[in-house]
Regions:
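An active-site-proximal structural segment forming one wall of the substrate-binding cleft
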Residues: 104-127, 145-171
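Short, flexible/disordered intra-domain loops and linkers
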Residues: 23-42, 101-106, 137-148, 186-191, ...
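Active-site groove signature of glycoside hydrolases
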Residues: 120-145, 169-185
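N-terminal pre-domain/capping segments
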Residues: 1-120, 205-212
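Charged helix-capping and loop-helix junction motifs
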Residues: 77, 107-114, 146, 150, ...
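Active-site-proximal loop/turn and secondary-structure-junction residues that shape catalytic pockets
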Residues: 20-23, 67-69, 96-99, 133-137, ...
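Acidic/histidine-rich catalytic cores of soluble enzymes
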Residues: 7, 29, 62-63, 164-235
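Alpha-helix-loop-beta-strand connector modules within alpha/beta enzyme cores
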Residues: 80-98, 151-168, 197-206
Length: 235
């Protein structure tokens, strides 16, 4: 049975996650900064997105793409163009790897990785950027005290403020930078909206506008140890 087109009347854009098409297989660059392609030479992400568009009776509007600072800039630009050719709005999820955003000694290298991704967003007129850049995925250590946690918050504010200022994001095409917290195990520090909120509040107070926001994943909220009502209050 063929399903006819279904109109999305919710007013909420429908998006897909590039990670569902594969992480190592589709998103992580090789040692030369090149992104995975299929046997036809097409980006794995673009090919998978096209298949989903063809299968879905509801129009798909956007795609989140995990983006690494080690990816060749020309590859980033080509992938963004490829998904736009499919009628999708690309949203970058900026990743940091091999550095600890909470460690002052790693600040310059973490900044360099963020700047590569922000540069791609600015070059390609992307309106929304996202990141998991407050902590290294699967490699963090829990804070030993409240004072250590507060120091990690302060270092993240310093790092992300530098990225905002040095990339020239004020008045740019980028409307918002949405930072994501992850479930315990993936992160060790910023594992709930309550723990992430001090970073966002501190950044927005410094720049004087609500530019930094939380990227909310309902599953991560459920794993965070906070109830639905507690999450609602913080949101």
């Amino acid at each position: 049975m063929t399903i006819g087109p279904i109109e999305n009347i919710s007013g909420i854009p429908l998006g897909i996650l590039g990670t569902h098409l594969g992480f190592l297989e589709a998103l992580v660059p090789d040692d030369n900064g090149m992104l995975p392609r299929n046997t036809d030479g097409e980006f794995v992400i673009a090919a998978g997105a096209r298949e989903l568009i063809e299968l879905s009776p509801v129009k798909i509007d956007l795609i989140q793409i995990s983006s690494f600072g080690t990816t060749n800039p020309d590859e980033k630009d080509a992938l963004i163009a490829a998904v736009r050719d499919l009628g999708l709005e690309p949203q970058l999820v900026m990743m940091v790897g091999g550095v600890n955003p909470m460690n002052p000694d790693d600040e310059d290298e973490a900044l360099a990785q963020l700047m590569v991704n922000l540069g791609a967003a600015l070059r390609n007129n992307i309106a929304q950027v996202n990141s998991t850049s407050v902590e290294t995925w699967m490699e963090g250590t829990p804070p030993s005290s409240e004072e250590e946690f507060e120091a990690r918050v302060a270092q993240n504010i310093k790092l992300h403020l530098r990225a905002y200022e040095e990339a020239g994001l004020a008045g740019s095409c980028i409307d918002n930078w949405n930072i994501e917290f992850l479930r315990p195990g993936e992160f060790q520090n910023f594992t709930s909206l309550a723990k992430l909120r001090p970073i966002l509040t501190g950044l927005n107070e410094k720049i004087g506008s609500p530019f930094f926001k939380a990227l909310i994943d309902a599953a991560h909220c459920g794993d965070s140890g906070l109830s639905i009502s507690e999450n609602e209050v913080i949101v």
